[in-house]
């Protein structure tokens, strides 16, 4: 089987597993909390999965020389307009989370424009970096910084928009990480990368200390981390460093219990306890904890192996491509998927603060699923381009 066909089936398998878990982990929430039928979330995710796979297959058949840039610019410019438009929509046409409007209600389906903007932003970076950093000869740090200024302006504007209108620091961190690493892949120096990371860290600290709910999240994270970390230190040192009276992270606490209950082989599909009111949204951001409880450590390893295969296949396609903007886009898709997975997994494990990022393909959410299918579909079209 060819690389692109393997990629299609690998992504489809992850989508199937996500649909399966959307039923297994959401039945209690669906019936008890929302008073829907037990198949409510399952059917919605199944419909999104079918549409996503069809889109993925359809995009794999398009000619990227004609459609890649058109689709990329569409995803770059239309979602921001929708995000701004949501601010003026009545509550009947929009859904809120975290104090911000994030979804447009379209009857059976709710659309989250930010999920599609991430693909558009990745396209913009690939398209633009291929014209600047890739096309230029080796430059010193000062010249690189001058070249980087327009990107920083675009990112700051994006960060302000997402931060103010969407109140979503997690997505800003994700897009910033993609920008920084993609700069290195496009030929930027390690010194430039270090300066960008330093600046991003300073801005992140400022964003945290100016927001009460982010400070609380940081305290919840440190409360859980110090309990695990200080067990490795001598008692006297641990007691000296410990900060008492910190709130305990409800989500991470129950996620840890779920992973402990799952053990090596898991409780069995549908037999987990975490979904029974302990974590009502386990089928979304905490899906890895639900998988760990029902499928065990081995089941979780299977999921990570599938993601690893997916990433390797995309890298192989990127390596075959001669056009820099195409190969950079493929790398950007890898970064979006891998960073989302790692940030979510580290949040569930208590290593990082919980950021609310979905696990690609596995977490419940039609917009996230469709956006990832579009990204994979475009990669598949580029793989077909290498054959032509």
Curated annotation (Swiss-Prot):
The gene is ftsW. Coiled coil: none annotated. Its main location: membrane. It is a multi-pass membrane protein. Residues 28-38, 92-105, 166-168, 211-294, 349-358 are periplasmic. One of its GO terms (molecular function) is lipid-linked peptidoglycan transporter activity. Belongs to the SEDS family. FtsW subfamily. One of its GO terms (cellular component) is cell division site. Pathway: Cell wall biogenesis; peptidoglycan biosynthesis. The chain crosses the membrane at residues 7-27, 39-59, 71-91, 106-126, 145-165, 169-186, 188-210, 295-315, 328-348, 359-379. It catalyses: [GlcNAc-(1->4)-Mur2Ac(oyl-L-Ala-gamma-D-Glu-L-Lys-D-Ala-D-Ala)](n)-di-trans,octa-cis-undecaprenyl diphosphate + beta-D-GlcNAc-(1->4)-Mur2Ac(oyl-L-Ala-gamma-D-Glu-L-Lys-D-Ala-D-Ala)-di-trans,octa-cis-undecaprenyl diphosphate = [GlcNAc-(1->4)-Mur2Ac(oyl-L-Ala-gamma-D-Glu-L-Lys-D-Ala-D-Ala)](n+1)-di-trans,octa-cis-undecaprenyl diphosphate + di-trans,octa-cis-undecaprenyl diphosphate + H(+). Pfam families: FTSW_RODA_SPOVE. The keyword Transmembrane helix applies. Keywords: Cell cycle, Cell division, Cell inner membrane, Cell membrane, Cell shape, Cell wall biogenesis/degradation, Glycosyltransferase, Membrane, Peptidoglycan synthesis, Transferase, Transmembrane, Transmembrane helix. Residues 1-6, 60-70, 127-144, 187, 316-327, 380-388 are cytoplasmic. It is found in: Cell inner membrane. One of its GO terms (biological process) is peptidoglycan biosynthetic process. Its EC number is 2.4.99.28. The keyword tRNA-binding does not apply. InterPro entries: Cell_cycle_FtsW-rel_CS (IPR018365), FtsW/RodA (IPR001182). This is Probable peptidoglycan glycosyltransferase FtsW. Peptidoglycan polymerase that is essential for cell division. PROSITE patterns: FTSW_RODA_SPOVE.
